[in-house]
From Swiss-Prot:
This is Polyadenylate-binding protein 2. One of its GO terms (biological process) is mRNA 3'-end processing. It comes from Dictyostelium discoideum (Social amoeba). The keyword Lipid biosynthesis does not apply. The lineage of its organism: Eukaryota, Amoebozoa, Evosea, Eumycetozoa, Dictyostelia. Residues 1-43 are annotated as: Disordered. The keyword RNA-binding applies. Its main location: nucleus. Residues 101-178 form the RRM domain.
């Protein structure tokens, strides 16, 4: 359309004005969307990252628990056949029966090797497994180990080596005791079950609970 007074094209100007306004609105809308996206995405990514970290941590804890349940130490247990101490290395017998023919050896020199310990205890009887305890964080030896014999009779001979010197350190040897749940180590049982409170004399769990009045004391060398 043409203006008769000045000869300008009014319709074209109106169309250009509308197009300009649309472009401005689109620019503002795109800008707002960009701001929203840039504001939301980092937060969403951070949440996803934390969730993945939590999943990894839960997986590691599950693996650690499974290892502890399948093997007493989870590391450095070596059988005479050369098997490293994992769940498959243990014989398919009751854990308490295995412990009944094993001894705990404390104050062991940190540099002592499996072969040295084996040679030291071979005179007591046939050794089935030696488990050197290590720190789960550093992997360094704790200065103690378990020696498992084939026969229970070997325990008597091994106990005779208590206070003997091995690699210039005086060994402390005691019969190995089966690991007890936490609440049993504290001398109490969950509600509804009998506790370890007793009168005088020695308690009834393999001589491990000494009486007295009130709460019994549960001795564990390891």
């Amino acid at each position: 359309m043409t203006d008769n007074n000045n000869g300008e094209i009014v319709e074209d100007k109106d169309n250009e004005k509308l197009k300009g306004e649309d472009n401005i609105n689109n620019h503002i809308s795109n800008h707002n969307n960009t701001e929203e996206t840039s504001f939301e995405d980092p937060e969403l990514e951070e949440m996803k990252k934390r969730f993945r970290e939590m999943e990894e941590e839960a997986k590691k804890l599950t693996e650690l628990q499974n290892n502890l349940e399948s093997n007493i130490t989870g590391n450095n247990g070596v059988g005479i056949g050369g098997n490293i101490g994992g769940g498959g290395g243990l014989m398919n017998t009751d854990q308490e029966e295995i412990d009944s023919r094993s001894v705990y050896v404390g104050n062991v020199d940190y540099k002592s090797t499996h072969d040295q310990i084996l040679a030291y205890f071979q005179s007591c009887g046939t050794v089935n497994r030696i488990t050197i305890l290590s720190d789960k964080t550093t992997g360094h030896p704790k200065g103690c180990c378990y020696v498992e014999f084939v026969n229970k009779e070997s325990i008597i001979n091994a106990m005779a080596l208590n206070d003997s010197f091995f690699n210039e350190r005086q060994l402390k040897i005691t019969p190995k005791r089966t690991n007890l749940p936490y609440y049993m180590r504290q001398g109490v049982l969950p509600p509804g079950r009998g506790g370890f409170r007793g009168g005088r004399g020695r308690g009834g769990i393999r001589g491990g609970i000494r009486g007295g009045r009130g709460r019994g004391n549960f001795y564990q060398p390891y």
